[in-house]
């Protein structure tokens, strides 16, 4: 597919609806989400949609940064960024936990929180930017937009002299080599049910 260049833009809550739609499509086939939100049980799509909605709404409500890629004003890629001093706030919010319990159920919320805590436990000491959600819309994958999104993200995070880097994770083996080509080094592995989540 041809390489396309997208406009890089810092996003605010006005992009919440587009962000939720994009991230839902990016994560609905993710093996980690399939385990966390029980893809074998009816209602899986609704649980993924609800989780993405709650994460995105809380992210923008706390005025945390997000970088987007736009082509002809359509959001095609996004990275939600949790700066070093704020990265734990979302899952520690009781209102967020309550909304998750009501929309995804106790077992899925518990699984998600355990996964989140296990990933954060892999972080080395020091301040890092963490990416709770990152994705390129499936219709636009294979066009080097993932590379463009990560470059924009790295440039933005580099402006914070107090940060030692960016941390992300994936349980999708398809993305392992991609992240390594972008210069990421694996710092840990987390067992998420039958899935091995790689932390970079």
Whereabouts are the PLM-identified features?
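Conserved beta-hairpin
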Residues: 62-79
């Amino acid at each position: 597919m041809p390489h396309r260049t997208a406009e890089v833009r810092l996003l605010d809550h006005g992009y919440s609806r587009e962000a939720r739609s994009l991230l839902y499509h990016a994560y609905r086939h993710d093996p980690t989400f399939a385990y966390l939100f029980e893809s074998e049980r009816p209602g899986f799509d609704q649980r993924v949609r609800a989780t993405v909605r709650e994460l995105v709404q809380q992210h923008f409500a706390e005025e945390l940064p997000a970088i987007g890629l736009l082509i002809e004003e359509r959001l095609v890629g996004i990275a939600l960024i949790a700066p070093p001093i704020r990265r734990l706030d979302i899952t520690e919010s009781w209102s967020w936990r309550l909304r998750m319990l009501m929309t995804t159920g106790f077992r899925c919320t518990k699984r998600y929180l355990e996964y989140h805590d296990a990933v954060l436990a892999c972080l080395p000491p020091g301040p890092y930017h963490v990416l709770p959600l990152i994705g390129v819309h499936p219709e636009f994958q294979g066009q080097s937009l993932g590379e463009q999104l990560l470059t924009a993200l790295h440039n933005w995070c580099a402006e914070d002299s107090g940060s030692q880097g960016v941390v992300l994770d994936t349980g999708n083996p398809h993305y392992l080599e991609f992240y390594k080509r972008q210069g990421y080094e694996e710092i840990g592995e987390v067992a998420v049910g039958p899935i091995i989540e790689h932390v970079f």
